[in-house]
């Protein structure tokens, strides 16, 4: 212990005597360790921590599969699954919904869920107050009840301890509060959910051919495996198909662990980020190893004297490693402070669509990770220089043979190897960043098929209790006319299906198309729109015409389709043809009056879930179906000014028609589009930042290596210049030495990049993982940086006075 304390005191004294080296080393480590700790804190919050439910590994999410792919669950099928399963301890259905909360205070749109009895018990959660939904409340005709979140209880009802049994108004209906959920409870979507109502009382979810966004939560019995559950549910699905062949042909059950379902989409991006910061730290370690090798050469006399006084190699290695560990621990402390600052930035501006990211914090796990990383980093960058510096030949050293000659030869290969590895890692990181930047630029530049500029969007939901008959149509048409009279407004329209927000789809049959088997009908995104919709959105007309004010109920039923549907099912000649819809209560065939351009509805990455689109005129919808088609509408307002500045005036028009209607999801279409690619923006900007840091470290490392080489070869350069060598040849000599190292590293890096970038393939859009232009561009950039890093010490070498150089020691 005494000798260790002595080593620490000596190391501190040595580092204090070299403030320049110590500062550079600590700052380099702080950047590398801090970046790793910050990303680990995000990974820890999002991926590592278990889901906040008892035995979360037993929780599964079930969805239906069909011949067309995955879909939501039919409610009657859910009931049959529940009755037929023996390996699941419990099973419950839920679907996302939202509700107008009215009564005391301003009307407010509440994010909510419809859940079946047993849903809360399946999660293993008990209410803070009250009780869960009972089976008697989860059926047709039951009195409406609601469970509310702790946040809503506090915000809207001031934490009223007598809230149970009181009524709140949701969508125009009185609901009795039966439970307040725990303060720390989170829905597994990790999005805010404030109200939970029984799903079984909802009439529109009870039809077997209706798939209204339901997913099924289930808990495996102890001892049951996922494979056994999948086999059992395949048998159950086959029995349902046999009983209902027309409606369940080809339908199965997809079972995924809840954690995988919730976090699976973000895991690849976060793993890539963690790998990127790991590469930055390795580059930093290589840099510091080179610095320590240079210091080791300069300290050979000191080490020789210590050997002569009896210090063994083990003691010397321990002393040198102590210095490295002190540097890494100091860098770790600064890195932890940097990580805490970065974490606060993430919490203040959390990227959208990354679950639990707002829970990121510097906790005991992050502190432990940082400490471990600091120790490992100190060993990684300090061990090789310590072993090399302590492996001196005592006799040769005392004779002075080790200085510039043998010492330099011993260190040269290791230093060059480290430099090659730095450039290899840097090129791999730069290629990855460049590919992601190109992919993001491609998504950002996608033409969505309409003009999103100066276009305001908002959502309005009508409560069924107050809007029967023609009232929905009358309301929307009045609102359209009133909003159109506002200053700077150029056009107003409404639709049931806003891009990047909602996803209504409909099966169809094209004229002349053979009736397919059940489950094989084509799907199209279904837009119910007002007159003027295409002009407001500026969707181009390809052929025919769009809806006019004269297209109303009682006239011929018209439909407008997109060019994809026209090309696939009508060979581009669709005008005058008809589209019909399967089902007994479906409308009669509709005549195609127009073909418009395809619009991007789901994602800017080019992977449209449903490639076809069709449009119906809302005024043509028969009166009994007006509420069903228009219970929720997105209002679109095109303006000549700032769309967000217009929002209060439009909201006032809604309140003027019905003061109990909340207006929500108020965004410009540009903001809505930007939000849809927020996760890609987050990961791309981070990797680009790490790549820039890696490039800076690599350039600094090469500069240091060449500068050290020049200092060691000062006498040689002086001799060359004395013998008549021109400055140009000296420049070429020094720059060439550095370029050889850089090009060797880039060669290794290119080979590594070809293998590594394949892991990015799923995150790339519009560019391949082996894009030649990207690889070539990065190689040219790195070559230019290498030339600059070598040119500065090379210029210094050409200014050496030959007489001074000949006397250089």
Locate the predicted segments by residue.
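Membrane-helix entry/capping segments
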Residues: 1-24, 53, 67, 106-109, ...
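Alpha-helical transmembrane segments of integral membrane proteins
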Residues: 1-22, 258-263, 291-318, 322, ...
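Short, strongly hydrophobic transmembrane alpha-helices
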Residues: 18-46, 50, 283-285, 332, ...
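Small-residue-rich transmembrane alpha-helices
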Residues: 42, 289, 325-397, 438, ...
